[in-house]
Amino acid sequence: MTRVLVLYYSSYGHIETMAGAVAEGARSTGAEVTIKRVPETVPIEVADKAHFKLNQAAPVATVAELADYDAIIVGTGTRFGRMSSQMAVFLDQAGGLWARGALNGKVGGAFVSTGTQHGGQETTLFSIITNLMHFGMVIVGLPYSHQGQMSVDEIVGGAPYGATTVAGGDGSRQPSQIDLAGAFHQGEIVARTAAALVAARN
């Protein structure tokens, strides 16, 4: 059975919600799916004052376990057009896995959240994808078979590089059904691609 990890960092819950949809999409293929988050690096008292969502159900991941999965789909909110420092710190610790090629040939994908429509969605996706490519991973985005990203009738997330959502400057906008459908679709396609690669190797 194909093993998929949905690995995320979420300050306010938007990416946590998207991660659930990504996982549902991957599970729809019959894959074994695990959702985990990276450790919070902001001091708890500071995070609490900033109203971070600290009571998230997903367990905290370890770097060593990344090698146990056939696919890893990484999600985070943007920080000035790039991935959050929490996610960057976590991935930066994977040098040992990189050195021994432990992630070579595994499937990777990315999904993100920004405060505004033009707040760095694609550059944040690229910052994650670049990292995964250095690990030797095969990247799967969000193809236009997800028609929702073609809509101009409302604010929608989604790019060919990965699923996205727009949280609003004050965080009041939650992922829409179109955003969640994109996340589901990406999870499904990543899992199917990973299954095909595993079967080909066997």
From Swiss-Prot:
Binding-site residues, substrate: 98
The keyword ATP-binding belongs to this UniProt entry's keyword annotation: no
Q: Which GO terms describe its molecular function?
A: flavin adenine dinucleotide binding; FMN binding; NAD binding; NADH:ubiquinone reductase (non-electrogenic) activity; NADP binding; NADPH dehydrogenase (quinone) activity
Q: Where is the Flavodoxin-like domain?
A: 4-190
The catalytic activity of this protein is classed by the Enzyme Commission as 1.6.5.2
Instruction: Cite a GO CC annotation.
Output: membrane
InterPro entries named in the record: Flavodoxin/NO_synth (IPR008254), Flavoprotein-like_sf (IPR029039), Flavoprotein_WrbA-like (IPR010089), FMN_Rdtase-like_dom (IPR005025), NQO (IPR037513)
Cofactor(s) demanded? FMN
Catalytic activity, per the record? a quinone + NADH + H(+) = a quinol + NAD(+); a quinone + NADPH + H(+) = a quinol + NADP(+)
User: What domain of life?
Assistant: Bacteria
Which Pfam families does the record match to this protein? FMN_red
Q: Where does FMN bind?
A: 10-15, 78-80, 113-119, 134
Q: Which residues bind NAD(+)?
A: 12
Give the cofactor note text: Binds 1 FMN per monomer.
Q: Which UniProt keywords apply?
A: Flavoprotein, FMN, NAD, NADP, Nucleotide-binding, Oxidoreductase, Plasmid
Q: Keyword check for Oxidoreductase, yes or no.
A: yes
Q: Identify its protein family.
A: Belongs to the WrbA family.
Protein name according to UniProt: NAD(P)H dehydrogenase (quinone) 2
Q: Which organism is it from?
A: Rhizobium meliloti (strain 1021) (Ensifer meliloti)
